[in-house]
């Protein structure tokens, strides 16, 4: 007669009821331990990050993703599925989660740091658009392993994945959550529903991005924002298999080989921008490359002038359809509100289509390198930062209704924060999560979403704001009348007299001791 162990082996019950594959729960689904499930779902979500060929530090790297985008994906997953209830999750703690995943070999950094003549891989995960990572490939089947000696769960790739994960040598997963000051929610409340269609998720992201923008920026009209639809880039990128068939492919390859031969990140970033230039400009650059003996200034100026010429003659990357948003961000900067301005800029860039975001990211990275005062001097009489601003302002934002001062302020602000402007704000993650959960649960998705267009204030604060705003606008009107050179002296005196009769206190406050000389 067969023993119980033999029957279990014949029915493969060990695999079915292992810690990685627990017996069915009350709802009939197979669920692993809660911590193991959370880690597995995080790793599975991370595989949705955009992976493609990228160029960095003078080399091309295949199948890479950006550190900041990995944080965005994990952040969105944690907030959307509410593993920790309604607890607010700072971005810095999501970075620590990514650090733990890198420590246990889910992915690895591909950018190396040179120390004392030796290359050494970075050990600290960087939430940056300049840091590249790659999943570790292995054909081994992976599951959630449990260290029986201390009960620690190890995050591993799902069995259908081809990524390998080594045992976690840091504290257990439960300890990691405690160290992050995050309390896991009731497992019965964890969102295990199927994913929504990508179209629905995309519409929610755009809707909530606009909603958050309206909370940060005062807009006179909403039509342009509410009717906004991403526009395809003017110069579409050519597929790699089609690019091989064009006569200009060789010129682009020559430029890439030329930049590879130069130990200069400046040149590498410039050549990356050439991918978005038309063929005839790339051909001109390729066939006018200087000789090897030529000084750096000659070919760097050639690249800088070519890229600048292209972007001076095309529409800005921050499209004029969102002009009111750009004006609002500039007003925030004028008033010294840098944090809201940065978040509004991040939201504005989130509305761009993916090709435009990638083009802007490359251009901004090149601008930041070229603006560095320690880099090659672009102009003899002007520092690099001002030269870059003057050359590429039209490429970033250009509208005749936005004053030059505010335009320059906005461009320099984006340039100074080029490492942060492509990150997704945590507030947007929370808003998108709440909306998606409401849709999945079948409840009203627009209920309890916070104010969008106004905020309730008490009567005293309202009256004070009304008086201050009225006084400010009256002073602005008085200044316009007094400094308007197109008005004749007689007409100006008449208008000032009318203003004095209607608002004598504001008139006296503005002119002070000069009242008699101005009014008479």
Curated annotation (Swiss-Prot):
One of the GO BP terms on file: intracellular signal transduction
Annotated DEP domain residues: 45-137
InterPro entries reported for this sequence: DEP_dom (IPR000591), WH-like_DNA-bd_sf (IPR036388), WH_DNA-bd_sf (IPR036390)
Chain intervals for the UniProt region annotation (Disordered): 148-167
Pfam family, one: DEP
Family as reported in the entry's similarity comment: Belongs to the DEPDC7 family.
Entry protein name: DEP domain-containing protein 7
Native species: Xenopus tropicalis
Gene: depdc7
